[in-house]
C-alpha cells in the first residue's frame, strides 16, 4: 500500500530527486529510473534537492516514488490536487491514469469534482464519517441532494446544463458536446 499525505512535502526525505525515487525501491534500474523521471517531467532535476522544486514537481516526485514500487497495488492519496495549477493537474491526471492502467487501485480524497469525474470509476460520498452515496461519477455528481448531504458544491456545469435545458453535465467538455 502506498500512501501520500495531503502535505506531500513532509514525505520528501532525501537530498536529490534521484535518491527520493530510489530510496524505497532499491531494485529499480537506471533505465527504469530515467523513464520514470521523464514521465514525471523532472528528468532535468534528478540531482536537485526535492524541496527546491515547484509544488507541482514535488507532488509528482512523491507520487512517482509511490508508483515506482511494484508492490504498491493500492494507492491512498489525500487531497493530491491541493495547491496545483492547471498544468500540474493535467500531469497528475496522466500519472493517475497511468497507474490505473498498470493495475493499481487508487483511492483518493478530493473536493475536485471535475477531476474525480474524469478519473474515478466509483465515487464514495462521506458525511459525518458515514457513506451517504456510492455510485458512478455522473450518477453521484448530477444528484444535488447527494452533493448537499456530502457538503460538496454543486458543479457549475450542472447548473448551466439545467439552465440550457440539456442533459445533466458535470464538465465543460460535456456541455460543449451539447452546445456545439
Region annotations inferred by a language model:
Residues 30-45, 67:
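Conserved ABC ATPase "signature" region
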Residues 49-53:
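Conserved ABC ATPase signature
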Residues 75-78:
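Catalytic Walker B motif of ABC-type/P-loop ATPase nucleotide-binding domains
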Residues 86-88:
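Helix N-cap at the start of a conserved alpha-helix in ABC-type nucleotide-binding domains
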Residues 110-111:
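H-loop/switch region of ABC-family ATPase nucleotide-binding domains
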Residues 116-118:
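A short, surface-exposed alpha-helical micro-motif characterized by mixed small hydrophobic
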Residues 130-157:
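Conserved beta-strand-loop-alpha-helix hinge in the C-terminal portion
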Residues 147-180:
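ABC ATPase nucleotide-binding domains
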Amino acid at each position: 500500500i502506498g500512501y501520500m499525505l495531503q502535505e506531500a512535502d513532509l514525505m520528501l526525505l532525501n537530498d536529490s530527486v534521484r535518491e527520493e525515487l530510489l530510496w524505497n525501491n532499491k531494485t529499480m534500474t537506471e533505465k527504469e529510473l530515467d523513464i520514470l523521471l521523464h514521465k514525471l517531467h523532472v528528468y532535468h532535476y534528478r540531482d536537485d534537492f526535492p524541496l527546491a522544486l515547484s509544488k507541482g514537481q514535488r507532488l509528482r516526485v512523491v507520487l512517482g516514488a509511490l508508483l515506482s514500487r511494484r508492490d504498491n497495488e493500492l494507492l491512498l492519496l489525500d487531497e493530491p490536487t491541493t495547491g496545483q495549477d492547471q498544468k500540474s493537474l493535467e500531469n497528475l491526471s496522466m500519472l493517475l491514469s497511468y497507474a490505473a492502467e498498470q493495475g493499481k487501485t487508487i483511492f483518493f480524497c478530493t473536493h475536485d469534482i471535475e477531476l474525480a469525474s474524469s478519473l474515478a470509476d466509483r465515487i464514495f460520498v462521506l458525511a459525518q464519517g458515514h457513506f451517504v452515496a456510492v455510485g458512478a461519477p455522473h450518477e453521484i455528481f448530477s444528484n444535488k441532494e447527494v452533493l448537499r448531504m456530502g457538503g460538496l458544491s454543486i458543479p457549475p456545469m450542472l447548473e448551466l446544463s439545467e439552465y440550457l435545458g440539456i442533459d445533466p453535465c458535470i464538465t465543460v467538455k460535456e456541455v460543449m458536446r451539447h452546445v456545439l
